[in-house]
């Protein structure tokens, strides 16, 4: 598929979004690039929330131990790699929660459409914790629009959302005309269209954002 430079620029501007982080009850970081989790943990360390929930996909599990999780003194780090071994590879997905009491993890139910799967699991997690009334959602700036679409369709309208973009993964030396970035934007644009159709069967509760 061929996209002109002008069209790619328009797609990028249309997709990109991000809000200033603010104090909340929990931070949720979607699976994907490592910088998302580093940024989320930075916000957690700066006191933006008393807890953080990290979504860890199958391709992140092996290197997850490299993240600077806030383990209490004397606590043995969790071993996601061992926990994942008996699980079929396509179903290896975990939520890792960190708060003042320590670090724990749970398996994310299998399902299609990764981002929607994560937000539905987040809805279940929040439903078990009624004290969570506000969230900062962390992902890449081009992914957040699709994330917001899922949140509006799945999460309770009472939850107050802030969508924070993680730092850029890097800028192209040729001004952003590189083929990988073009393909990434084009694919995200197509995914957004697919999700719009899929989410028509969900009730959209008009969540608050901003």
Regions picked out by a protein language model, each given a short descriptive name:
Residues 2-179:
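A structural signal for short, hydrophobic/glycine-enriched beta-strand patches
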Residues 65-67, 206-210:
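Amphipathic, soluble alpha/beta structural segments
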């Amino acid at each position: 598929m061929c996209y002109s430079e002008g069209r790619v620029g328009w797609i990028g501007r249309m997709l990109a979004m991000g809000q200033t982080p603010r104090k909340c009850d929990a931070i949720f970081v979607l699976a994907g690039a490592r910088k998302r989790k580093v940024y989320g943990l930075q916000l957690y360390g700066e006191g933006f929330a008393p807890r953080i929930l990290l979504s860890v996909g199958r391709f992140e599990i092996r290197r997850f131990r490299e993240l600077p999780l806030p383990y209490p003194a004397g606590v043995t780090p969790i071993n996601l790699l061992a926990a994942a071994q008996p699980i079929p590879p396509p179903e290896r997905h975990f939520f890792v929660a960190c708060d003042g009491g320590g670090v724990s993890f749970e398996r994310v139910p299998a399902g299609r459409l990764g981002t929607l799967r994560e937000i539905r699991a987040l809805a279940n997690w929040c439903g078990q914790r009624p004290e969570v009334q506000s969230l900062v959602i962390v992902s890449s700036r081009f992914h957040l629009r699709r994330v917001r679409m899922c949140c509006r369709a799945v999460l309770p309208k009472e939850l107050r959302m802030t969508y924070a973009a993680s730092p850029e993964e890097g800028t192209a030396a040729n001004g952003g005309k590189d083929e990988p970035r073009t393909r990434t934007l084009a694919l995200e644009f197509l995914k957004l269209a697919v999700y719009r159709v899929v989410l028509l069967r969900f009730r959209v509760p008009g969540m608050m954002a901003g």
